[in-house]
C-alpha cells in the first residue's frame, strides 16, 4: 500500500542569474563603498551596513543603477505571472532600493519587510561557497512537526533537517544572482566568515496596487495617483 504525500500551499522563492558586465560590477561596488563612506556598519555592533537606514534607499533613481533596477523589475513581473497574477490587473511599484555591505564578522538579523509586498535581493559578490554569509529564509509555519516546538531539536524525535520539517532554507550568494520572495517572509543573513571578502548586495522592495484606470478590487489598494493627502483635504 502506497502512502502518497501531498505538499500543499508552497511558499515560492524564485532565483535567476542576471548578466552583469564584470567592469560594471566592479564600478557598482566602488560606488556603494563611496556611499558607505567612513561607516563600518549599522549602529548595532556586528551588523552589516544597510543603506535604507542611512539615507541611501533610492538607488534606482541614480542613473548608474537604473538599468539594474529595470532588469529586476522585469523579473518581478515574471514572478507575479508565475504565481498566478494577471499582470494587466495590477500595478507594481518599486518603493525602495538600497545597498547592503557586510564586512568580516558582520550579519543581518532576522526580519521581514512589512511595508512591502514583494522583495528581491541582487548579489554583486559571492562564489557560491556561502563563506561570505548565506541568505537564510525562515519557515513561517511548522505544520508537520505536529507538536508545537518539536522540530527545534534538543533531543526530539524528528530527524534533523528533514525536508518536511525544515525550519530554515539557506542560499549562498553569487555575483549576479537575483532572489525574489514574499516580503512577509522572515529572512536573515548569516555572518560573513571570510576576512578577505566583502559581501555586497542590493535590496528591492515592491508594492502592489490596482492599475490607474478602472475600479480597484476589494482587497487591492487603489493606485497611488488616486490617493489624497489628508492634510490637503478641505471641508
PLM regions and their residue ranges:
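Histidine-centered active-site/metal-ligand motif
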Residues: 93, 111-113, 187
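Short intrinsically disordered coil segments
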Residues: 31-33, 135-140, 152, 217-227
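A structural signal for short, well-ordered beta-strand segments
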Residues: 97-99, 120-122, 202-206
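Short acidic (Asp/Glu) patches
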Residues: 79-83, 94, 99-109
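Histidine-dependent nucleotide/RNA phosphoesterase domain, centered on the 2H-phosphoesterase fold
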Residues: 88-90
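Catalytic core of Fe(II)/2-oxoglutarate
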Residues: 159-235
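Catalytic core of non-heme Fe(II) oxygenases with the double-stranded beta-helix
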Residues: 100-178, 212
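Non-heme Fe(II)/2-oxoglutarate
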Residues: 2-86, 107
Amino acid at each position: 500500500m502506497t502512502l502518497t504525500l501531498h505538499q500543499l500551499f508552497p511558499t515560492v522563492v524564485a532565483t535567476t542569474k542576471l548578466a552583469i558586465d564584470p567592469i560594471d560590477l566592479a564600478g557598482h561596488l566602488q560606488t556603494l563603498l563611496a556611499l558607505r563612506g567612513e561607516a563600518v556598519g549599522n549602529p548595532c555592533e556586528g551588523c552589516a551596513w544597510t543603506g535604507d537606514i542611512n539615507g541611501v534607499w533610492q538607488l534606482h533613481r541614480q542613473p548608474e543603477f537604473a538599468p539594474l533596477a529595470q532588469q529586476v523589475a522585469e523579473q518581478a513581473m515574471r514572478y507575479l505571472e508565475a504565481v498566478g497574477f494577471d499582470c494587466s490587473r495590477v500595478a507594481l511599484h518599486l518603493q525602495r532600493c538600497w545597498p547592503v555591505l557586510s564586512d568580516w564578522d558582520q550579519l543581518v538579523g532576522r526580519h521581514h519587510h512589512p511595508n512591502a509586498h514583494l522583495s528581491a535581493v541582487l548579489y554583486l559578490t559571492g562564489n557560491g561557497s556561502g563563506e561570505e554569509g548565506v541568505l537564510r529564509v525562515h519557515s513561517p509555519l511548522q505544520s508537520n512537526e505536529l507538536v508545537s516546538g518539536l522540530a527545534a531539536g534538543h533531543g526530539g524525535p524528528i530527524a534533523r533537517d528533514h525536508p518536511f520539517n525544515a525550519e530554515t532554507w539557506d542560499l549562498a550568494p553569487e555575483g549576479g544572482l537575483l532572489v525574489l520572495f514574499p516580503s512577509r517572509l522572515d529572512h536573515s543573513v548569516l555572518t560573513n566568515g571570510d576576512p578577505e571578502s566583502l559581501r555586497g548586495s542590493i535590496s528591492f522592495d515592491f508594492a502592489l496596487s490596482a492599475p490607474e484606470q478602472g475600479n480597484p478590487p476589494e482587497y487591492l489598494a487603489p493606485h497611488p495617483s488616486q490617493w489624497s493627502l489628508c492634510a490637503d483635504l478641505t471641508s
